[in-house]
Each structure stands twice: as C-alpha cells, then as structure tokens.
Amino acid sequence: MRVIFAGTPPFAAAALEALVAAGHEIVLVLTQPDRPAGRGMKLAASAVKQAALAHGLPVYQPTTLKTPEAQARLADCAADVMVVAAYGLILPQAVLDLPRLGCLNIHASLLPRWRGAAPIQRAILAGDCETGITIMQMAAGLDTGAMLAKTVVPIADADTAATLHDALAVAGAAAIVSALSAYDTLVPQTQDEREASYAAKLSKEEARLDWQQPAEALARAVRAFNPVPGAWTLLAGAPFKILRAEAAPQGEADAPPGTVLRADPAGIVVACGGGALVLHEIQAAGSKRMTAAAFLAGRALSAGTRLGA
C-alpha cells in the first residue's frame, strides 16, 4: 500500500520500521518539528525522523495540519492509508478524509478503556493485569473511532511504564502490519461508550507520592511514573525521585505515614496509609540514580525521619 506515516517517539518508530520491512511504500513521513533536548538544548530529531532518514524516506514536519498548504502536501501523495502512532498533532477532518482507506491509529490500550494521552501509565496505576494495542479507524473524537483489531499484552508485576512501553511498541508494530495485510477482511466494531475511560495527561505534581495511600498503590505509582515524570517525595525539604520500590511484607511496625521505619542496604522502609513501602532505587536532586545502599553510604538516614515535608 501507499502509506503516509505520522508519528514522533520510539513507540511510533517501531511501527514505521515494521511497515518498511513489510514492503509498504511509505510515500511521506510526518513527525513533530525538531525540539531542543539534552543539557546543551540542541535541536534533536524525533525517533521517527531518524528512522525515516535512515531509510531515505521523505520527511515533513509541519507545526499544524490545518493549513491549505499542509493539506495539499498530503493530498499530492495519493495515499491509500495514513497510519498514525503517537504523532502529537490534531488531524482535522479534511486530513482524515484524504487517504482512500482513511486513517488508522495504533493506540496503546484495549479501547474503549484508557482513551487519551497516557494509557500505559494509567493502566499500571489502576492495577490492570493486562492492556494491549487497538488498531482503530480515526474519527473526530478522542480515540472514539471504530476498532479493527486488538492485541492483548499482559502487565507483569515488575513492569514500569518504560518496559511496558517497549512491549507495546513491539505489539503495535506487528498489529499494524497484520491489519494492513488483512484490511479487506476486517470488520469495524463500534466502541461501547459505557465502558470508556480516559487516560489523562500526567503531571509532575501527580507523581508526588501521597504517603496516606496504601503501599500497593504507591508501588504502582513508582512503576507507572518511571521514567517520566518520576515518582518523588521530599526529604528535609529537598525533592528526590523514587525509581524502584515494592510493598513490604506484612508485619512492619505501625507509624505515621511517611515515617522511615528502617534504613539499611536492603532498602529504606517507609510507613504508608496501609502497610509500608521499601525503596530500592532513588535519585536525589542533582545526583544520579543509585541503590538505597549507595544512598545510605553517603548519608545518614535514621528511623523516625519523616518524608514528604
């Protein structure tokens, strides 16, 4: 097929690579404009742009698709289909109507659950045991289009947003190739609005741990916010991130939430609203990530210390 591909991050780059490998003719690659990145804040190309250039594919980086110029550029491609994966720009109806077979989206959840910007993190936060990929026809609403195919991906107890992202990227790449090869046989299914839920965008403040919450919920938060924006709390008024943690076994002593119960090389144990959380990897402000043992080797932290203030 003649394909316009629209995407930006590594999740999307995996799908682009799979489409190229499957022999589809990628007539144009849309991706976000280069952005400042790194300590030097130099302009950096998106993962999709890098993949496209490596294959000699034409790249187009508009700031909007609402202009006549942008829409004319897409129309000139005479594409059979547009494949969209974490692109980051709104597709107006005029663009959705351009490809002969419409626009297909690779969404990282089992729709209609977790429509929206952060489906991977929301699935972990909610304690879901599985998530997946939905290939859907794009419509004007937020992830409301008819579903063409689904792939289930289990969520392991140790999965972070990063590891689950990688598993979903592989699944999404395979799913879109399969969907295009079987397109004529796929039957669109309308989403059940009664089962819809929304994966709101993450914020740094949301990633601040509330020690009043149960330990199991806080352990999920640490996994969900790893690597970005990173679960965090305060120690002596200074923020530090918690990168790996687990709910403690039963039997830890009772204490006000946020109180350090024990601090040794095996971990920093903190009382929660229910149970206790064991911190295994942390990152203090201005420092690199380190194990609890390494952190304690350079700083005294005694039982009774309060976190969060």
Swiss-Prot record:
Stored PANTHER family: METHIONYL-TRNA FORMYLTRANSFERASE, METHIONYL-TRNA FORMYLTRANSFERASE, MITOCHONDRIAL
Binding site for (6S)-5,6,7,8-tetrahydrofolate: 109-112
GO cellular component labels: cytosol
A Pfam cross-reference name: Formyl_trans_C
Name of the molecule in the record: Methionyl-tRNA formyltransferase
Entry EC number(s): 2.1.2.9
Swiss-Prot/TrEMBL keywords: Protein biosynthesis, Transferase
Enzyme category, top tier: transferase
Catalysed conversion reaction: L-methionyl-tRNA(fMet) + (6R)-10-formyltetrahydrofolate = N-formyl-L-methionyl-tRNA(fMet) + (6S)-5,6,7,8-tetrahydrofolate + H(+)
Domain of life according to the entry: Bacteria
One Gene Ontology MF term: methionyl-tRNA formyltransferase activity
Function: Attaches a formyl group to the free amino group of methionyl-tRNA(fMet). The formyl group appears to play a dual role in the initiator identity of N-formylmethionyl-tRNA by promoting its recognition by IF2 and preventing the misappropriation of this tRNA by the elongation apparatus.
Signal sequence annotation: none
